[in-house]
Amino acid sequence: MTVQDYMLTLGKQARAASRQMASADTGKKNAALLAIADAINSARDTIAAENARDMEAGRANGLDAALLDRLELTPERIDGMIEGLNQVAALPDPCGEITDLKYRPSGIQLGKKRTPLGVVGIIYESRPNVTVDAASLCLKSGNAAILRGGSEAIHSNKAVAVCIAAGLKAAGLPETAVQVVETTDRAAVGELITMTKYVDVVVPRGGKSLIERISADARVSVIKHLDGICHVYVDKTANLDKAFNIVINSKTHRYGVCNAMETMLVDEAIAADFLPRAAKEFAARGVELRGCEKTVALLTASDIPVVAALEEDWDTEYLAPILSIKLVANMDEAIEHINNHGSHHTDALVSENYTLARKFLTEVDSSSVMINASTRFADGFEYGLGAEIGISTDKIHARGPVGLEGLTSQKWIVFGDGHIRN
């Protein structure tokens, strides 16, 4: 069978399964999630053995330490997969919710009903636990899913797929509601993102090159974010103790995540009081500082290591212990910098001025805008969404962390009693 024929088969099966999933009741969906959790728990040894095969192949193929870390399924990570399934089962089911019900002057009753998207294709790299995260969210939201993991995790993903199929079968749902692509041929991705008849939306999770390629080539809708160039602006009215804790947490809590601060903006009026203190702490934690001309002058005078920032630094997602710092004259300059150089992901203001906070919320064009809080809160779990399928920086129905509701849409529903239009 050719890759094209194989993917076509998956697409047809997913479309058929999606129709059954759309009408599946909450009890059945939750039963499937709990049965998958039980199956994974029972298959721990098999999953670990298959993951060990992937790890061995990864080392032989020269995968770097970061990729190997994401690939590994430790006992704790398997526990996390099981816990994630239990958490999603406990979340409210968004499907079927009817809102905005009202009568029109014509006498008809009009409302909106939340419905699944249909078939969701998810393309991701390295992390086999994403297979479970993606499957659980798609199932609970009434969708069918086609999951294409990285070739480096093929054995792990196949082992997890067996558990997912067993859980679906035990709950009386179609086993084809979640299908893992079992070929490592890259042509499978090209087929998946162009099957407009069978796939409704694609969610890429991975490096920038993967997401750019899918965005350029896809013929189905894409939910994505390319970069997490997140800013924290410390305004002149800020409580400096609050600001210190927020910027340190935003940058150093975890470096390799999309909601970590990459650029810190500081009002010139408080720079002398605030910047050396914060910079000294960053330096003590091993963070390389790259500053504008004024930043370099101020920190050099305080004997704090700093290098001159290049223009491209303002447009870089480091995912590393590196921080760009720029002094600005006022909030207008800060907002202009964020909107010109940011990635519409997450940006924060530290300020005690209510009027300025309102201005920041209104004018910063990002999927999450925060006042006096760390950018690290931009996360599906922290937002009460449970697991997330990803974070969208596009201006579509799903913006910011995409949980269950982001995998649904709304259709108009109309009730009449023989009404006709005059």
UniProtKB/Swiss-Prot annotation:
Transmembrane segments: none annotated. It is found in: Cytoplasm. GO terms for cellular component: cytoplasm. The keyword Amino-acid biosynthesis applies. Pathway: Amino-acid biosynthesis; L-proline biosynthesis; L-glutamate 5-semialdehyde from L-glutamate: step 2/2. GO terms for molecular function: glutamate-5-semialdehyde dehydrogenase activity; NADP binding. Signal peptide: none annotated. Its main location: cytoplasm. PANTHER family: DELTA-1-PYRROLINE-5-CARBOXYLATE SYNTHASE, GLUTAMATE SEMIALDEHYDE DEHYDROGENASE. Catalyzes the NADPH-dependent reduction of L-glutamate 5-phosphate into L-glutamate 5-semialdehyde and phosphate. The product spontaneously undergoes cyclization to form 1-pyrroline-5-carboxylate. Belongs to the gamma-glutamyl phosphate reductase family. This is Gamma-glutamyl phosphate reductase. It comes from Saccharophagus degradans (strain 2-40 / ATCC 43961 / DSM 17024). The gene is proA.
